[in-house]
């Protein structure tokens, strides 16, 4: 039974990721006053499958000077981590109920840095290496903010268990008392997933395509799949942490439906930002984090630690 659940979850995520790619291309098309993909299948609905077929049937070329093992392992590692992160998410019942679910997500998502680092270094290309250095610095930097925001959230929730967040938000969303945290979290997730306006790693005018410049065919597709899977995951986390859905034990499908709608709306916001905003300069990106977000999240963390002590109120203990 657990194997069937795992397969169903994986298949659902991969199908959602495929159609997210199509949706993005459609939205970008309409914002630029054109149609987007509309040839393959009705309204272009079969375009993701045509792309997958094309990429996975092509010969995966490899630079002769590359480090073979790391070059091959990196894309597979990126997608594996992206799928692994879904296991502790309660929708409303998680695949694996972890007491330290938030910590697991934080620790596992930080491993994505290795796939980026290996892919750029193993490619033996200057463009890929510069893209890698940018991506790694950006990802590691914004993880600090995400960790501090999660720490503030679990001080309000009282547990590392993600299922507790559903109980915490029975009466009102955490978005209402902690909207500055939610705003910084959302912007940090944009940076963490290397999305516009923070897509410095894929600065086409400077770096060709970033850390995946030397990749083609299947491995290239795996990187893209990992990126879009991470986008859905980050929005699912945002919906779970700040826009919690009340769970009625008699109708779990209602919880799942509402949770999915919230995730879809947040993902649409990601796509709207992609089609609207220009790319930041690299120094502005780092300035935003180290000079603005970090002091503010630290101040809010101190506030969330000191307030319960001052008022002799403690969060629910599990």
Curated annotation (Swiss-Prot):
It comes from Pongo pygmaeus. The chain crosses the membrane at residues 2-22, 69-89, 100-120, 146-166, 171-191, 222-242, 253-273, 294-314. Core subunit of the mitochondrial membrane respiratory chain NADH dehydrogenase (Complex I) which catalyzes electron transfer from NADH through the respiratory chain, using ubiquinone as an electron acceptor. Essential for the catalytic activity and assembly of complex I. InterPro entries: NADH_UbQ_OxRdtase_su1/FPO, NADH_UbQ_OxRdtase_su1_CS. HAMAP family: NDH1_NuoH. Belongs to the complex I subunit 1 family. It catalyses: a ubiquinone + NADH + 5 H(+)(in) = a ubiquinol + NAD(+) + 4 H(+)(out). Pfam families: NADHdh. This is NADH-ubiquinone oxidoreductase chain 1. One of its GO terms (biological process) is mitochondrial electron transport, NADH to ubiquinone. It is a multi-pass membrane protein. The keyword Transport applies. The keyword Isomerase does not apply. Its main location: mitochondrion.
